[in-house]
Swiss-Prot record:
Pfam families: DUF179 (PF02622)
Origin species: Shewanella denitrificans (strain OS217 / ATCC BAA-1090 / DSM 15013)
Name this polypeptide is given: UPF0301 protein Sden_2674
Any single GO CC term annotated in Swiss-Prot or TrEMBL for this entry: cytosol
Protein family: Belongs to the UPF0301 (AlgH) family.
InterPro entries to which the protein is assigned, alphabetical: AlgH-like (IPR003774)
Length: 184
């Protein structure tokens, strides 16, 4: 299977009632060892500004109330992950695409609270991870649909609308799909 890095995983309706119900996950890494991604449409009810204040970091910049901390996934829920535009690289940054970098070091949080903030960012606690061949099996089991990610879908779409808009990118009504089709 080709790498799904820089793709979105869209939860199938069959995941309703689970942790991943109507989630959209931005895949940051995918290779023969497994995969890692960040849920980009599940706010936890805490603004980024409030998080910075809790961490005793300056919040000089006027952060939008729309800048919410996300549940990135069930793995390491106390660890922060920041998806951001690549204007600058911080201590622990890795490019995911030409429009998105993943940073896990605290220095980016200092920048987010200042005039040095990246133009686009999402802050998440935790990540979603898959061991070797686990994601491939979940795809074969019709747990996820995939589309190529875009800057607009990753950064610009409202959290509540992202799952619906991402499913529309597929070109069909996701509610008409059966989880039992496509495999012999």
């Amino acid at each position: 299977m080709d790498s799904l890095k820089n793709h979105l995983l869209i939860a199938m309706p069959s995941l309703d009632g689970s942790f991943f119900e109507r989630t959209v996950i931005y895949v940051c890494e995918h290779d023969e060892k497994g995969a890692m991604g960040i849920v980009i449409n599940r706010p936890i009810g805490l603004s980024v500004e409030a998080l910075l204040i809790q961490m005793d970091l300056d919040a000089e910049a006027n952060l939008s109330d729309d800048a919410q901390v996300l549940i990135g996934g069930p793995v390491l829920p106390d660890r922060g992950f920041v998806l951001h535009s690549p204007e600058k690289v911080w201590t622990n940054s890795e490019a995911v695409s030409d429009y998105c970098t993943l940073t896990t070091s605290r220095d980016i949080l200092n920048a987010i609270g200042s005039a040095d903030a990246p133009s686009q960012f999402k802050v998440a606690l935790g990540y979603s991870g898959w061991s070797k061949d686990q994601l491939e099996q979940e795809l074969a089991d019709n747990t996820w649909l995939t589309i190529k990610a875009s800057s607009e879908l990753v950064f610009d779409v409202d959290y509540e609308q992202l799952w619906t808009l991402a499913t529309k990118e597929l070109g069909f009504d996701i509610w008409q799909l059966s989880s039992q089709t496509g495999h012999c």
